[in-house]
C-alpha cells in the first residue's frame, strides 16, 4: 500500500526525568530501534530565568508546543497558567479533526487531577486511563506497570490514532538514589515497557495498512545526586527520539526542540495547525 494511503497514527511516550547522556550511554534496545528508523536528537530546556526544570513545566511545553513564557506553567504547584489558551496537542488534533481518536495513559497528578496546573490533558483526550500513584505503595514503580499494561492492550486492539503514554519510575529512582545503577535499572524497565507497546502495535491485524510514528521524550534531567529544578546542564538536558515503524523513508530535521513534538505529530496525522494556535515548534518531518 502506498504511504499516503495508509492511516497515520502517532504514539508519544514520555519518560520522566531521563538524562540524555545516561540514555545514550546505555543505548537501550527498544528506544535505539525507534531511533534507527528515524533520528535521536539531544535537546536543551530553557534556563531558569525562563522557568525551573520541573515536571509540570516540561510536560506543559511538550504537550502544548509552546515555551514556558507563553503557557506560563512555571512550577509544579502553580495554579495560574494559560493552558486554556494553549491546550494539549491531543485536544488540538481532536478539535481540528473530531475523527481522530485520542488516548492517554498516565499516573502523574498533573494529568489526572486539578493539582497545580492540572489537568494538563484536556477534554480532547477522548479515552483517558489514569492511576492515582498515591494509592500504590511503590508509587510510580507500581503504576507504571498498570499504565504499560493498559497501553499495550489498547494499542494492540483498539483504534486510537493519537496516543500519549507517561511513565514516571525513572524520575522517582533518580530522586531516591541519584543517577547510578538503580536509575539505569529503571530506564531499562521503561525500555522493556516500550518494547511491549511496539510489539503490540506490530501485531495489529491492520498494521500493514497503517503508518505509525513513535516519539519519545523527557521533561527534564537530574543532577548526579538526584534532583532537579535548577539550571545545571544535567537538569536542562532532554531528548527527542522519533521513528516510523514501517521503515518508510523520511527526511528529518537536523536539529530539534521539545516544542517540535506537537507539530510533528500533527503533520503526520495530516492536521494543519491554525495560526491562532501560536505554536512555537516546527515539524521534524520534512514535507
Predicted regions and their residues:
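Feature captures the catalytic ectodomains and active-site-proximal regions of enzymes
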Residues: 1-287
